[in-house]
Amino acid sequence: MNLVITLPQIKHLAQTGSSSEYFFFFMERKPNIIMDGFFTKISVSTSYFTMNGLFLTFGIREKHTDDVYINDAVSSVQNGYDNKYYIYFDPYTIENRYTTECVIQLEEIILKMYGNTIPSKTPVYSLKTQLQGGTFKIHRERSNEMQGKYILKISGVWESAHSYGVTYKCTVYS
């Protein structure tokens, strides 16, 4: 079972600085074999249970046309391998602006919390950079799976000698 957090809940968390429903905490730092650094899992807890990772749902309406999916705000193109697709969108439309602001605020909250433990390192806002640029990568099984709804999983924080940032993956919500 996974607990999914909605955009309004993220907005509330960003505005108040706290949540009566969710508590975030970081697990033990472990060496990262992919990069020279460390990985720390993020856990989310409620009064009922605790789980690894943070799951956020968000939606973007899409229109399908051949191999490229286009509407006024969104288009996606398959990269041709590993079931990875790039979603291109206008981050400044009303619908998309709300989504990007919420996700950016969530990333900022997590990195601020983590940064309190390592003040000498610089945060890297990779989600913010991608979303403000109007793109993100998703994982899906079939090209006809585009439904305009996605799940962002933030599994933890990576840390190198000088910087740190969130580790995340986007998938199609089914």
Which functions belong to the PLM regions below?
Residues 1-117, 173:
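OB-fold ssDNA-binding interfaces and closely related basic DNA-contact patches used
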Residues 155-174:
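OB-fold single-stranded nucleic acid-binding module
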Residues 81-142, 147-154, 162:
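Fold-level signal for large, globular catalytic cores of enzyme and receptor domains
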Residues 55, 147-149, 165-167:
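Broad gene-expression machinery/nucleic-acid interaction feature
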